[in-house]
UniProtKB/Swiss-Prot annotation:
<dbReference type="InterPro" id="IPR027417">
    <property type="entry name" value="P-loop_NTPase"/>
</dbReference>
<dbReference type="InterPro" id="IPR005790">
    <property type="entry name" value="DNA_polIII_delta"/>
</dbReference>
<keyword id="KW-0239">DNA-directed DNA polymerase</keyword>
<keyword id="KW-0548">Nucleotidyltransferase</keyword>
<keyword id="KW-0808">Transferase</keyword>
<keyword id="KW-0235">DNA replication</keyword>
<comment type="function">
    <text>Could be the functional equivalent of DNA polymerase III delta subunit (HolA).</text>
</comment>
<dbReference type="GO" id="GO:0006261">
    <property type="term" value="P:DNA-templated DNA replication"/>
</dbReference>
<dbReference type="GO" id="GO:0009360">
    <property type="term" value="C:DNA polymerase III complex"/>
</dbReference>
<comment type="subunit">
    <text>Seems to interact with H.pylori HolB.</text>
</comment>
<dbReference type="GO" id="GO:0003677">
    <property type="term" value="F:DNA binding"/>
</dbReference>
<dbReference type="GO" id="GO:0003887">
    <property type="term" value="F:DNA-directed DNA polymerase activity"/>
</dbReference>
<protein>
    <recommendedName>
        <fullName>Protein jhp_1168</fullName>
    </recommendedName>
</protein>
């Protein structure tokens, strides 16, 4: 089935097993999250086990699907397989996983096979084999396969409008289109920006989009971030940004967003030992950007992040009290935390 079919299916029932694949990774990621949330909403005692290509273990996964939860709940197994790294995974593994789900239980399986643009032929071959296992399963329509294609611009805008409606976001079609264009028609980035805009809890303006969108003003802010990590004269850069018309509040907001993302990378790397941008950000930036995030994230320890976020709290508080150009006061202490 395709995305529209999946949406209709999920309105009526939940599958026991689902295989998500195709050429658009963002939809694979989005529907893994969506279906997981539906499973948990239907059975709050669900225990989730997440496996990536690097920690894939066939026997452990089969055991989780075969047995009941220790506390009488159910098991949800999620396989996020990056095709380029899926050496441990064999297509034939799918058969025992589906077999395990034939017995009466509330256990569930979600498989997301992320695309490999470097080897589309092999990806297609692997996907087709998995689809055949699903089609032959006695689970019948409880085991579904969904193929995603890169959406056209109008499809992306429709998807964003549906998300805006879900968030009760007051944004016109014209401004939604502007957000999409500012983000270079990147659906995943625009999707995440809607969540940020929803925090405002007010009708959205073009200025809101320019201030909060992930790419607006990024080049100037990147100069400041680079200065912080490379021990450059950040006060000169900050002064330049102010003279160019950048607001102190905008600079603070941009720094908060960046360091929050850094902390997410830091926590994810420390917890899993992996650097999975899709899991952290919800989309996959270019390799160079991911590597830079990871490198900078590990420059600080947990205590360092706490100190930086405390500075941001004070900066925001004093800004609300009417004090201006607080970067002159706080940027140097932040730089010293990064470069002790």
């Amino acid at each position: 089935m395709y995305r529209k079919d999946l949406d209709n299916y999920l309105k009526q029932r939940l599958p026991k097993a689902v295989f998500l694949y195709g050429e658009f990774d963002f939809f694979i990621h989005y529907y893994i999250q969506t279906i997981s949330a539906l499973f948990k909403g239907n059975n709050p005692d669900t225990e989730t086990s997440l496996f990536y290509a690097s920690d894939y273990e066939k026997s452990q996964i089969a055991t989780l699907l075969e047995q009941d939860s220790l506390f009488g709940g159910s098991s949800l197994v999620i396989l996020k397989l990056d095709f380029a790294l899926h050496k441990k995974f064999k297509e034939n593994d799918i058969n025992p996983f589906l077999k395990a789900l034939e017995r009466p239980s509330h256990n569930r399986l979600i498989i997301g096979l992320y695309n490999a643009k470097s080897d589309t032929t092999k990806y297609k071959y692997t996907s087709e084999i998995i689809v055949k296992f699903f089609q032959k399963s006695p689970l019948k329509d409880e085991a579904i396969c969904v193929r995603f294609f890169t959406p056209k611009a109008w499809e992306s805008l429709k998807f964003l409008q549906e998300r805006a409606n879900f968030l009760h976001l007051d944004i016109s079609g014209h401004l939604l289109n502007a957000l999409f264009e500012i983000n270079n028609e990147d659906l995943s980035v625009s999707f995440n920006d809607l969540d940020k805009l929803a925090v405002l809890n007010a009708p959205i303006t073009l200025e809101d989009i320019q201030e909060l969108s992930s790419n607006a003003g990024d080049m100037d802010l990147q100069k400041l971030i680079l200065g912080l990590f490379l021990k450059k004269s950040v006060l000169d850069i900050y002064d330049y940004l102010l003279k160019e018309g950048k607001k102190d509040a905008d600079i603070l907001r941009g720094l908060e967003r960046y360091f929050y993302q850094l902390f997410l990378f830091f926590a994810h790397i420390k917890t899993t030992g992996l650097m999975d941008a899709k899991e952290v950000l919800g989309y996959a930036p270019p390799k160079e950007i991911v590597e830079n995030y990871a490198k900078n994230a590990l420059r600080l320890k947990e205590a360092g992040y706490k100190r930086v976020f405390e500075i941001f709290r004070l900066w925001h508080l004093q800004s609300m009290q009417g004090q201006k150009e607080l970067g002159f006061l706080y940027l140097t202490p932040i730089q010293k935390i990064i470069n002790p």
